[in-house]
């Protein structure tokens, strides 16, 4: 880690090191002094022997040196521990600060995510409540509403509506019907192909002769002349099977109802057509009477132009339009004489 630069002032560790170095230098000086004194003592001992005093001095000096060295070592260890403690403390503080910041960021993010979740839940609930509050009519499109209204509205009872309903029912019944191949009681069948003309379901044949009890209907033509008596029998393995299905009850009821409806429609249609025919007949008679009257008036007015006028000139008779007073025989004797001639 890069620590910030400190001011240029003597720190505690630098002062301790200076003192240690000084003490070492002083101990070196003391040792030199001790050596000199020892040498002097040796020389003096040679001159005047005093071994007890010399030993005491040496022991004291040695103790003093050992004490100083021990003190210096203890001080240096304390300084190193203090520096390591301070560095570890600073690093731990930095790490704790970073962890605190991370925890704060995580807490803020969690709060934000929780708020966003709550907002989304609220919006979803509001949308659901709006959808449930809306009625079914609001949800349906306009076209569906219009169709339902048209279905609900009652059709007017009129001959045109009856005609249209009758025609629609006829077309629907014709579409539902299936074209079948009718086979008479005695028929001659000639065909070069063995394909089936009509097959309602899958064709199945058994060895039994009671094929009429099956729920299948199939007509098959072969290139052999076959006469059918109405019974479902095999003729030299070239047969025509005709099976009738049992009509269920509900289909029978439906067919009866449909027949009743068709009969009602037919009667209504006949009545309507009769009324329409009578109206047309009356109208045609009226028009014919008017035309005859107009023809009569035209004949009476055209009689003037059909009169013959005779004029004699150059030995020939000419037919022209009548001139005033030329048709009177008394006034015009020439015309009368010519007519007599």
Swiss-Prot record:
GO terms, biological process: auxin transport; auxin-activated signaling pathway; positive regulation of auxin mediated signaling pathway
Record keywords: Auxin signaling pathway, Cell membrane, Membrane, Transport
This protein's record includes keyword Membrane: yes
Role noted for this protein: Involved in auxin transport. Regulator of the auxin signaling pathway.
Annotated family: Belongs to the BIG GRAIN 1 (BG1) plant protein family.
Main location: membrane
Residue span of region Disordered: 28-61, 76-138
GO cellular component entries: plasma membrane
Name of this chain's protein: Protein BIG GRAIN 1-like C
Localization terms from the record: Cell membrane
Superkingdom of the source species: Eukaryota
Keyword Cell membrane recorded: yes
Biased composition (Low complexity): 76-92
Basic and acidic residues: bias regions: 52-61, 105-138
């Amino acid at each position: 880690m890069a620590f910030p630069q400190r001011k240029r002032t003597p720190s505690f560790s630098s002062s301790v090191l200076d003192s240690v170095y000084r003490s070492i230098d002083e101990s070196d000086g003391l040792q030199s002094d001790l050596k000199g004194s020892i040498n002097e003592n040796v020389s003096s001992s040679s001159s005047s022997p005093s071994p007890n005093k010399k030993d005491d001095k040496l022991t004291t000096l040695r103790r003093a040196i050992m004490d100083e060295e021990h003190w210096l070592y203890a001080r240096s260890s304390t300084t190193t521990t203090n520096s390591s403690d301070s560095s570890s403390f600073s690093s731990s503080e930095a790490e704790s600060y970073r962890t605190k910041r991370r925890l704060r960021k995580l807490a803020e993010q969690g709060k934000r995510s929780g708020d966003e979740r709550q907002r989304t839940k609220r919006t979803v609930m509001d949308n659901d409540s709006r959808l449930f509050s809306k009625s079914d009519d609001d949800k349906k499109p306009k076209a569906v509403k219009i169709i339902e209204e048209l279905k609900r509205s009652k059709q007017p009872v009129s001959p045109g509506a009856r005609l249209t309903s009758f025609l629609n029912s006829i077309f629907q019944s014709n579409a539902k019907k299936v074209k079948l191949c009718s086979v008479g009681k005695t028929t001659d069948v000639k065909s070069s192909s063995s394909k089936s003309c009509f097959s309602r379901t899958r064709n199945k044949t058994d060895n039994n002769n009671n094929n009429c009890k099956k729920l299948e209907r199939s007509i098959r033509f072969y290139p052999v002349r076959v006469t059918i008596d109405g019974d479902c029998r095999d003729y030299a393995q070239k047969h025509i099977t005709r099976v009738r299905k049992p009509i269920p009850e509900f289909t029978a009821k439906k067919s009866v109802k449909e027949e009743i409806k068709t009969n009602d429609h037919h009667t209504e249609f006949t009545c309507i057509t009769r009324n329409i025919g009578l109206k047309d007949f009356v109208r045609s008679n009226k028009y014919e009477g008017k035309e005859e009257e107009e023809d009569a008036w035209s004949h009476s007015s055209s009689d003037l132009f059909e009169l013959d006028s005779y004029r004699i000139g150059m030995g020939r008779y000419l037919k022209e339009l009548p001139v005033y007073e030329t048709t009177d025989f008394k006034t015009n004797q020439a015309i009368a004489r010519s007519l007599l001639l």
